[in-house]
Regions:
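S/T-rich, low-complexity, solvent-exposed segments of bacterial secretion/appendage proteins
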Residues: 1-561
Length: 561
């Protein structure tokens, strides 16, 4: 047997034990012992599980690394080309060729953003399918292990000897199962194998086996997760970090650590570019003498209700908070409501709960509004205790990134409004239909926050609510809006001083390039999270994926070396 089975997978060398026959007729075979060490096998299976996870992770992350590192097909050269076309426009603001060049580079850039998101989304869907395939193979293996436990017990009872062939099959199955997932093996009295998940939930217990299922995540219908079906037939979703070893663990870990993060970073980059550019474009005037509109469109945030919510309340609207896009982060969020009806908002990337000052919740008796991290959600009622929601602000934003302009005359290269003064403000923006009255406005802010507006009687809002300059005062952080022009006051004047701001419709002509220059300057502005330029953010993402790829390869080489 030892010679004929030398290449048989799972075969263990056998040792024949001889003894004197009872009839003094020479020797007889007393036993055939299988040479198998459970401790060595356990260590080998653990190493196999770890190596399999790393190999799977390395195979997946290398695809993203190759995508991002391609200097010709990457986003960096296309963003550079887009801003270079703005430089050409600034040099000849009324030239049709310069305007057509800008639209062409914008279309090419947005198409590449969509292609990147599509590639990453295909990987998400591919992982969903691979998880389902792995679960099928795992269930087949655990069912066979339970069957072998029964057959081995029966064989021992019949002959009183170890059925070596069946034992080899069982240990080979455990080794193959270890390639797919990390597991816990316990040998009970009677030599039966019990297999359980790392969290202790049984998969094989004697002659019984329990099934895993690839199920739709209860918090995200686009995501496949592991479900555990107990003896009562109840299906419960497992935490995504339950399995960390084997092919299955490699897929789950890669998705959580790298794929989700990269897709969110691409989305954050797209939203930051679109929001910043649209804001500046609305401050411009086109060749028809009209205010500029949104140059780009972008996908809005996604929000999902947990399937076990009991309050019957859904998120009816999810949108970006244009005044607070510097708070936008490349992460998903989990919202959970407490007994008092207040939300608790947690970042999914690091598990940090947002402080009370980082979100705002308001329920008016009919509709709830929650703002945090650069997004605003509208609820159609008051969620009850335990209700949960999954929010993906930027995950699929790039999938719907498009250029809105096809008419060359609609490019707002000239300046729509003029502004000057020493008032400390930021986020100056023109909403649709701004300055329709044609008035020029003069504002004066005192150290105590009192605001004088000329002409008097002009409608003013503060943080979205009516503001009366006669009785109300301004504090740092307030957002004011007058005739469609909005801005945030960042600081009050020093003691004994006042600050002023004047704005109105600018005089513009076909040769005006002031807004084209302002849009070009966005290339170096800190548009991403208020801390990084577009090129810096993209370079950081490429570097992060590259570093992760190298770490995985080094660890894999160490395991296989």
């Amino acid at each position: 047997n030892n010679i004929s089975n030398v290449y048989t997978p799972g075969y263990n060398r056998e040792l024949t034990i001889l003894g004197q026959s009872r009839a003094d007729a020479g020797v007889q075979v007393n036993d055939i012992q299988r040479q198998f060490n459970h401790y060595v096998a356990s260590q080998l299976n653990a190493a196999t599980s770890s190596s399999s996870a790393l190999k799977t992770y390395e195979n997946q992350i290398s695809q993203i690394d190759n995508l991002l590192a391609d200097r010709e097909a990457g986003l960096a050269p296309l963003m550079q080309s887009f801003f270079s076309s703005l430089e050409d426009l600034a040099g000849a603001p009324s030239d049709p060729a310069a305007r057509q060049g800008l639209l062409g580079s914008a279309d090419t850039m947005t198409a590449q953003f969509r292609a990147f998101d599509g590639y990453l989304q295909d990987m998400q869907e591919g992982i969903n399918g691979q998880i389902a395939d792995e679960v099928t193979q795992i269930n087949n293996a655990t069912e066979q292990l339970a069957t072998l436990n029964r057959e081995i017990a029966l064989a021992r009872a019949r002959s009183g000897k170890a059925p070596n062939s069946l034992l080899n099959q069982r240990d080979q199955l455990v080794a193959e199962l270890s390639e797919r997932m990390n597991l816990r093996l316990e040998i009970q009295d009677g030599k039966s194998y019990n297999i359980s998940l790392p969290n202790g939930q049984p998969l094989v217990s004697g002659t019984n086996h329990y099934r895993l299922e690839a199920m739709e995540s209860p918090s995200d219908p686009q995501r496949t997760v592991l479900g555990y079906k107990d003896s009562g037939g109840n299906l419960v979703a497992l935490s995504e970090d339950t399995i960390t070893g084997g092919t299955l663990g490699g897929l789950m870990t890669f998705r959580a650590e790298t794929l989700d993060k990269t897709q969110n970073q691409i989305g954050q980059l797209a939203v930051s570019l679109v929001a910043g550019f649209n804001q500046q474009h609305r401050l411009g005037m086109d060749l028809n003498g009209d205010q500029g509109g949104d140059f780009f469109s972008i996908g809005q945030p996604k929000a999902y209700s947990h399937e076990r919510n009991t309050g019957g309340v859904d998120v009816t609207s999810a949108s970006f908070d244009s005044a607070n896009l510097d708070q936008l982060r490349a992460t998903d969020y989990t919202i959970r409501f407490d007994a008092a009806g207040d939300p608790q908002v947690t970042r999914n990337d690091n598990g940090r709960a947002l402080t009370a000052g980082e979100f705002a919740w308001d329920f008016d008796g009919t509709v709830g509004e929650l703002s945090f991290g650069g997004v605003t959600l509208i609820f159609d009622g008051q969620p009850v205790e335990g209700d949960r929601y999954q929010v993906q602000p930027v995950r699929r934003a790039a999938a719907e990134m498009n250029s809105n302009i096809s008419d060359l005359d609609k490019i707002a290269a000239g300046s729509f409004m003029r502004s000057e003064g020493d008032m400390a403000i930021r986020n100056l923006r023109a909403n649709d239909g701004a300055l329709t009255t044609g008035s020029a406005y003069s504002l004066e802010l005192a150290e105590n926050g009192s605001l004088t507006v000329v002409p008097g009687g002009s409608p003013v809002t503060r943080n979205g609510e009516a503001f009366d300059p006669v009785t109300d005062t301004v504090v740092a952080g307030d957002t004011l809006e007058i005739d469609g022009i909005a801005f945030e006051v960042t600081a009050l004047p020093n003691a004994g001083e006042t600050a002023s701001l004047e704005f109105g419709v600018a005089s513009s002509g076909t040769g005006d390039n002031r807004n084209a220059l302002a849009m070009q300057n966005l290339q170096d502005a800190s548009l991403v999270a208020g801390r990084a330029s577009l090129s810096q953010a993209y370079a950081g993402m490429v570097s992060d994926v590259g570093n992760r790829t190298n770490i995985v390869k080094v660890n894999l080489d160490a395991r296989q070396g």
